[in-house]
Amino acid sequence: MAKLAVIRIRGRVNVKRPVRDTLAMLRLHRVNHCVIVDDTPSYLGMLQKAKDYITWGEINAETLAKLIRKRGRLIGNKPVTDEYVKEKLGMTIEEFAQKVVNGEMSLKDLPNLKPVFRLHPPRGGFRGSKKRSFKEGGALGYRGEKINELIERML
């Protein structure tokens, strides 16, 4: 089971109620926030409902490790460190990220980790309109493995 990275692209003005509720269930309350979800039919249905406000794709272990190391926060807004992960789980951030991507562990297995990653806007911009789908040269919707490039630019 793959893990999907979901990033909110568009803001909250004129969002229809069902879409707003779906974004709230995904914990995507603000622009440039990212969450990691499972590749299950229920989540895929939620992503399809909110596809005009988000982008998503399969995240790899290397990008997830960078995301946790650079943007991961613990309760109290403390950064996630190698020492903390080693103390709680007995492994490095890279090993933890690999197990999360493979489905052996979940992000919830790391105690006190906040589920939302707050990212910067991408360096170089979104390379097109924020209002069109990725297939049409925009920024929205499913983008597959290219989500890793976008996350790298947003770290």
Swiss-Prot record:
Name of the molecule in the record: Large ribosomal subunit protein uL30
GO molecular function: RNA binding; structural constituent of ribosome
GO biological process: maturation of LSU-rRNA from tricistronic rRNA transcript (SSU-rRNA, 5.8S rRNA, LSU-rRNA); translation
Entries under InterPro entries matching the protein: Ribo_uL30_ferredoxin-like_sf (IPR036919), Ribosomal_uL30 (IPR039699), Ribosomal_uL30_arc (IPR005997), Ribosomal_uL30_CS (IPR018038), Ribosomal_uL30_euk_arc (IPR035808), Ribosomal_uL30_ferredoxin-like (IPR016082)
Name of the gene this protein is made from: rpl30
Superkingdom of origin: Archaea
Record flagged with keyword 4Fe-4S: no
Quaternary structure note: Part of the 50S ribosomal subunit.
NCBIfam families: PRK06049.1 (NF004711), uL30_arch (TIGR01309)
UniProt keyword annotation of Ribonucleoprotein present: yes
Pfam families listed in its UniProt record: Ribosomal_L30
Organism: Pyrococcus furiosus (strain ATCC 43587 / DSM 3638 / JCM 8422 / Vc1)
